[in-house]
Each structure stands twice: as C-alpha cells, then as structure tokens.
Amino acid sequence: MKYYVSTAFLDTHEVIEIAKAADDLGYHGMGIPDHVINLETLKTPYPNTKDGKRRWEAFTDWPDPWVMIGAIALVTTRLHFVTTVYLPAMRDPYSAAKSIGTAAYLANGRLELGIGVGWCEEEFTLMGQRFDRRGRRTDEMLDLMKALWQPGWTEFKGEFYSAPRLEMEPTPPHIPIYVGGLSDIALRRAARNDGWIGDLITTDRAIERVDRLREMRAERGLSMDDFTILTPLTDAFTPEHYERAEASGINGIITMPWMFYTGPESTLAEKIDGMRKFRKDVALDG
C-alpha cells in the first residue's frame, strides 16, 4: 500500500515542511488539490456533500498546484506528487500542458496527474471556458497534451482543438494520468487511463468501484496490473482495515494522518508528529 499525505485546506506555508517530513518518513506521495478561486455565492451545488455545501471555509488556501509541486520537488528526493484533482477543461490546453510538463520535468518522474471534469459552472464561466461538453473536451485535451509532451515536432486536429506543426520544451518524463470521480462516466474515463482517484468514501463503496473498474478494464482487454486505485477511506483506521483495502485492489491511500490524533486545528509540529505516529501505527514499512 502506498500512502499519500493530502495538503487540502493546509496553510500554504506549511506545505514545504509537511513535504520534507513526508519524504523523510517514507510516505509515497502528497496529494495537491486545485481551485483557482472560491466564489462567495454559488448556484451550483457541491456534488460530494448531502446538503450541497462546500467542505471548506471561505479564505481557505488553494495554492497553484504546479507552482507548489515545482517548489516541493526541489526540497524532496523520493516523494511523488498527485493532483487531487486538476481540471484541464477549465484552462487552455497549451498553458496547462506547459505548467504540467515543467512541473513534471522538475519532479524528474515523480509527478502523477490526477484530473477531473469539474462541477462548478460559475468557476468555468469566470475562466472563460464552456461548462457543457467539458468531459469530451477533457478527453481531447489529454490527447493533445500527451502529443505536446513528446519530443520533436507534433501537430493535432480534433473536434475542439487544432495545432499546427509545433514543439514544446522542456520534454517531461512520462506522466501517468489518474481520473477522479464516482460516476460510471468517470470510472470509464479512468479505465482508459492509468488510474482512478476516489473521494471520501467507505471501504465497501470503494471496493464496489474497484470491481466496476476491473470489469471496464477487462472489456477493453486491459488488466489491473500497474493500474492505480488511490482514494481516501472514511472508515479505515487500523493496519487490518488497510490490509482489507489492499486485498481488494486498492493500492493507494490519501490521508491526513494528524486528523487521527490532534484533529483539524493541529499546529505544524502536531501535524508532523501525527505523521510519525501514523507511520508507526499502520506499519508503513510493512
């Protein structure tokens, strides 16, 4: 099992020290969330809570994920970084490819691109991007960005984007792509790529998604070998819980270790101490 420390809702100044600690303590990676802005009033309900309200308070930090990854890549040696999740369709494909590719180059093979199609229509509008057909645009953007990340000249013609013969440097190492979401559409998109990222979910519900992904991969003649299943679990607290998850095919856990010990108001020192305790309590070294 690989453990990723989530940086969601952290103060930006804490992330560097959390990353250094995670690197030293043997965590596999860090999860880096993405929001450009936080609007005071929304008509669009948040899809992952029963009441449609956002999980975060106003004035929560949302640092740019690629600037953040570039910074922490330079102060760590083995830690991986995954976006949880980035919304390509809210940007233009060339700026997105440049930012992602540069961060991947600096991370030297330690970047994992987690993507979603988004839920907040108002944020798309503010960014000058259409909300409708964002799923199809996301698929095409991924194809275009993969072409831009290859060495040499490339050109592209699609339904939404076209590119004359061009090149983009620096050329990054291979970037695995994981897709977030709980719907069948999101799972199918994940099955076509390199992995799936879940939301806050029980182990039983996560296992249902794993079984569905296995079916979808089999339909395409693909195995689950080297396919990443990465999710937070709301009811996993012990080594036995994580062993059950791993036996089902879940191979990555997103967690905030300090939440098990000192809670959401933890100081930076308490967060790092919680990471040490969690490492010991779940037998991170096996």
Segments from the language model and where they lie:
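Active-site-adjacent structural elements that line small-molecule/cofactor binding pockets in enzymes
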Residues: 1-286
